[in-house]
Amino acid sequence: MNFVQENNQVLYIWGGTISADIEQEVNQLKSIPGVKVNVENAERVLLGGYGQSQFDIILANVSTGNSELVSHLLKLTKPKGKAVFKDDSAAGGAETVRANLLLSGFINIASAEGNVYIAEKPNYEIGSAAKLSLGGGANKAKVAAVWKLDVDDDGEAEERIDEDELLDEEDKVKPSAESLRVCGTTGKRKACKDCSCGLAEELDAESKGAAVAAAQSAKSSCGSCYLGDAFRCATCPYLGMPAFKPGEKIQLSDTQMQADV
């Protein structure tokens, strides 16, 4: 009875049949100022309809091996409230009782004479959550300050790079159009598929100019080119042209340039 204080809410649980000792203990509890006592049989506790965290002290003459009942008594106890068990049926003694109470959620378990065991409910409700402070704020501030540069700091130890020193005189020379060409810069001169630097047009003009020059400078090696295709070689530059007089300048009319229908 030393566990009960004034104005406590007490749940007294008895097992078996009511005896004179039980009535005497209940009367002693009621004599404490402000104490309210609820008396319940062990088999009826689960059906009693008591509220969660209702009692400051629970006095239970029950077996701690009944895990369902012990867990229910934990719910009925207020945070930091106590439950006092009198267990005469524990086969393994104090260690077994201690293990049963710990597995049910009680802490700070102590034993007393007469197979009496005192257990305490943790200072929080079952299912409650609490925010953990892992000290991340201080570490974040330190990390953020590592790369921070003070623009007003004129300390002599600070070394800065002059951007002008990163460029050589060759880098400052304006490039020419030839140096910017992409196609035709490796091996044989060949324009890209989507040439935009002018090389395609240049090569096309060169090829046409070469063909014209070849035609203008063409000379007969057989001496019979002017006679017509029947007397011309397969590689004759005048192949396909009409016969002409030796030394005559060849000009094709518009009608000759049109294909026959």
Curated annotation (Swiss-Prot):
Motif Cx2C motif 1: positions: 222-225
Binding-site residues, [2Fe-2S] cluster: 183, 192, 195, 197
One record GO biological process: iron-sulfur cluster assembly
Residues given in the record as [4Fe-4S] cluster binding sites: 222, 225, 233, 236
PANTHER family from the UniProt entry: ANAMORSIN (PTHR13273:SF14)
Subunit structure: Monomer.
Free-text comment on this protein's domains from its UniProt entry: The C-terminal domain binds 2 Fe-S clusters but is otherwise mostly in an intrinsically disordered conformation.
UniProt protein name: Anamorsin homolog
Organism expressing this protein natively: Culex quinquefasciatus (Southern house mosquito)
